């Protein structure tokens, strides 16, 4: 695959108002993607655009709109809406393209652009390369004549539509009556729709992270900072806590004791429940190289398989589609239930967990830990430039670490696709050895990254 100049593992992402997350780049994305997804017939073409609650969304959105309308595409604006909601609305409105403006779990200063095809799935690497090629060419050719410019309209009921779609995924005849739930929306895109969905299903809802101001998205809240959720669960004696990230495509949960449960455990719970109901497809689960070995062992004990992909929920979804799987995701909390959505959806995954809990006579603490994870250690090393992983010293440290584990665990070292970080992960039954090999690899990376 050719090297991509703009797109990473999850669209284009970076600090707002710095390359590549500038108004100029957003304009070029709109023009290039618009040209690529407009067919040659004379019908009107449509793109839908949603965003999270970052201040910079007000800069990126009009730049994208200018790009799309300049090549003749009509635009529908949703305002704040979860990423999976944008994917759903792309399909339901029969749009040619869907766009989400978000940097997911990142700090407010970052932003990003994610693109969805007319089928509601994230674009392939090949499509992103085609867009990049058009962005780097002269874009003045093919501009719409004044009478063919795109028209723009704001859609006011998209949040209500998403709530209804989410509620429809909950088992018929079941409600959340009698359940007390803490929901942390990370001051992000789901700040209205997630609490409303739970409330309309009958739950008593304690809300946090529902006062976005443009700057506080993911700030000490949401799935990357679950302490706020855990504290409130214990304070209000809730049955469960749910924490979403800024664009609500991932989640973590906690039990009634405030103990946090990651994406691996959530996938195990849903897969086990669906397998018992005869609903699980593909004979197992798709996850990434970062998922815990304990998940693999848990599934194997139930005659189910774990298939691994590179990091990135779109790669998980691609493998799910190829192999006919309907449960997949990432340890970080992207959980994809392809019967229900075309991308990771934190709220829909939470509803499936809540259904299992409501139908059980056991507390969440008895359901949450489906398997015993093997000791796993992850460290991130920030670097300025260059390719630390190609350095001989790092390669030597990796080879020595593999020898020391001697087949009793796994090592995954990779460059982040969204931040200037090298992620070093090791896992195995010997916790002390795992910590040692991570320390040695991190030390080697730091030396060459300095």
Swiss-Prot record:
Q: What does the entry's cofactor note say about binding and number?
A: Binds 1 Mg(2+) ion per subunit.
Q: Which residues carry this modification: Phosphoserine?
A: 104
Q: Which UniProt keywords apply?
A: Isomerase, Magnesium, Metal-binding, Phosphoprotein
PTM description = Activated by phosphorylation.
Q: What class of enzyme is it?
A: isomerase
**GO molecular-function annotation terms?**
magnesium ion binding; phosphoglucosamine mutase activity; phosphomannomutase activity
Under the heading InterPro entries, the entry gives:
A-D-PHexomutase_a/b/a-I, A-D-PHexomutase_a/b/a-I/II/III, A-D-PHexomutase_a/b/a-II, A-D-PHexomutase_a/b/a-III, A-D-PHexomutase_C, A-D-PHexomutase_C_sf, Alpha-D-phosphohexomutase_SF, GlmM_bact
The active site is formed by: 104
Instruction: Note whether Transmembrane occurs among the keywords.
Output: no
Any Pfam family: PGM_PMM_IV
The answer on whether this UniProt entry bears the keyword DNA repair reads no
Tell me which EC number(s) this protein carries.
Answer: 5.4.2.10
GO cellular component terms, alphabetically, are: cytosol
Q: Where does Mg(2+) bind?
A: 104, 245, 247, 249
Q: Which PANTHER family match?
A: PHOSPHOGLUCOMUTASE (ALPHA-D-GLUCOSE-1,6-BISPHOSPHATE-DEPENDENT), PHOSPHOHEXOSE MUTASE
| Protein name, per record | Phosphoglucosamine mutase
């Amino acid at each position: 695959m050719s090297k991509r100049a703009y797109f990473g593992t999850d669209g284009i992402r970076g600090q707002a108002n710095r390359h590549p997350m500038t108004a100029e780049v957003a304009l070029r994305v709109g023009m290039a993607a618009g040209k690529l997804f407009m067919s040659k017939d004379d019908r009107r073409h449509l793109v839908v655009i949603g965003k999270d609650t970052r201040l910079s969304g007000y800069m990126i959105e009009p730049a994208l709109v200018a790009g799309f309308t300049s090549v003749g595409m009509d635009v529908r604006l949703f305002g704040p809406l979860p990423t999976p909601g944008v994917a759903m609305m792309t399909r339901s409105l029969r749009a040619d393209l869907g766009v989400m403006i978000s940097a997911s779990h990142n700090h407010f200063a970052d932003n990003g652009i994610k693109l969805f095809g007319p089928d509601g799935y994230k674009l392939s690497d090949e499509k992103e390369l085609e867009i990049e090629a058009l962005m780097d060419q002269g874009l003045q050719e093919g501009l719409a004549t004044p009478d063919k410019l795109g028209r723009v309209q704001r859609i006011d009921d998209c949040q209500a539509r998403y709530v209804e779609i989410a509620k429809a995924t909950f088992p018929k005849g079941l409600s959340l009556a009698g359940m007390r739930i803490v929901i942390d929306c990370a001051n992000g895109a789901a700040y209205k729709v997630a609490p409303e969905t739970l409330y309309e299903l009958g739950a008593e809802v304690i809300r946090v992270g529902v006062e976005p101001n443009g700057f506080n998205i993911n700030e000490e809240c949401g799935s990357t900072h679950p302490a706020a959720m855990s504290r409130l669960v214990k304070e209000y004696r809730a049955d469960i806590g749910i924490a979403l990230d800024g664009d609500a495509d991932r989640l973590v949960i906690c039990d009634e004791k405030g103990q946090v449960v990651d994406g691996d455990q959530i996938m195990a719970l849903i897969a086990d429940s669906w397998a018992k109901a005869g609903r699980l497809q593909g004979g197992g689960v798709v996850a990434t190289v970062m998922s815990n070995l304990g998940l693999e062992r848990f599934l194997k004990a139930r005659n189910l398989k774990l298939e691994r992909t590179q990091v990135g929920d779109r790669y998980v979804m691609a493998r799910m589609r190829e192999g006919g799987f309907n449960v997949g995701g990432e340890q970080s909390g992207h959980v994809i239930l392809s019967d229900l959505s075309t991308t990771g959806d934190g709220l829909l995954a939470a509803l499936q967990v809540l259904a299992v809990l409501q139908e059980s006579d056991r507390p969440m603490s008895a359901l949450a830990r489906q398997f015993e994870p093997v000791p796993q250690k992850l460290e991130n090393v920030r670097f300025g430039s260059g390719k630390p992983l190609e350095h001989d010293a790092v390669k030597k440290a990796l080879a020595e670490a593999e020898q020391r584990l001697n087949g009793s665990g796994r090592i995954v070292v990779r460059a982040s696709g969204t931040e200037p970080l090298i992620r070093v992960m090791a896992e195995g039954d010997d916790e002390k050895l795992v910590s040692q090999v991570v320390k040695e690899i991190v030390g080697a990376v730091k030396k060459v990254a300095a």
